[in-house]
């Protein structure tokens, strides 16, 4: 195989293996795909591990983008620096990093994590701390972190910040996190900080939540956004209403209470770049969101360095690219609960 060399880089292959959308929008493995371009504000990363998210199978089905590489969350090794990144001295070739990219992107089709090499925005890439392995770093990723940044701070408008939570900055606010999940995951969500968990299978789940919150629940994030989850969320919201943050597009006819204000959040908008998706998911470039996102990621880096950013329990799926295809099907058919699927692509631990 021929090899090429970028500025500030090690010797690299001319082509790589990726999972991309074919001409019909279906995900397929291609073994002779070119390496992505190294833009001035980017890092070229050799991917060692990837995490699989529900959006990874949904993107190709809902937003066909023939030729686009799929996948978002990754961990790996820096092998080349963009010219602007090189000047800052913030990253070095050989460093271990993790983050999230916009996979299946019709505007930037080579930027997806299901690849041996990817191009990552340096401002939205974490340095992996010494105590953490790359397998766990892939579970940190960046997709969920970016989504929660927009959901908590922008959509719900919660006070405080990740490193200065409410209570430390303003005694007027008391935020009590609760969760809705399967009973088998009660201990897991409580270990992450939920003070109370409720069984979504229970026919009295909404009433139980209203009783526990004294009918004052005012902020809800719904990551599933199906008819039954929206009905539960709207029924559980307190008498005075509040903000409902949907991580999927919602049906207007299910917005049954005027005092509840719904909003759709698309996590990749935090990059500040145009999101060229339809069905309500798209957005124009937004410098304000990018500035917020950069600050949010810097705070997350501080939490990561301090060991205060927890990941889901990891479940490794073997088989490299075949393993990714298997993992996507596992998520699509709802075979995964309370775990993050991870696939090893490289040789590092």
Swiss-Prot record:
Trans-enoyl reductase; part of the gene cluster that mediates the biosynthesis of the mycotoxins phomacins, leucine-derived cytochalasans with potent actin polymerization-inhibitory activities and monocot-specific antigerminative activities. The first step in the pathway is catalyzed by the hybrid PKS-NRPS phmA, assisted by the enoyl reductase phmE, that are responsible for fusion of the leucine precursor and the polyketide backbone to produce a 2-pyrrolidone intermediate. One of its GO terms (molecular function) is oxidoreductase activity, acting on NAD(P)H. Belongs to the zinc-containing alcohol dehydrogenase family. It is an enzyme of class 1 (oxidoreductase). This is Trans-enoyl reductase phmE. NADP(+) binds at residues 55-58, 182-185, 200, 247-248, 336-337. It comes from Phaeosphaeria nodorum (strain SN15 / ATCC MYA-4574 / FGSC 10173). Keywords: NADP, Nucleotide-binding, Oxidoreductase, Virulence. It comes from the Eukaryota. Pathway: Mycotoxin biosynthesis. InterPro entries: ADH-like_N (IPR013154), GroES-like_sf (IPR011032), NAD(P)-bd_dom_sf (IPR036291), PKS_ER (IPR020843), Trans-enoyl_RdTase-like (IPR047122). Substrate binds at residues 143-150, 267-271. The lineage of its organism: Eukaryota, Fungi, Dikarya, Ascomycota, Pezizomycotina. Gene3D superfamilies: Medium-chain alcohol dehydrogenases, catalytic domain, NAD(P)-binding Rossmann-like Domain. Its EC number is 1.-.-.-. Monomer.
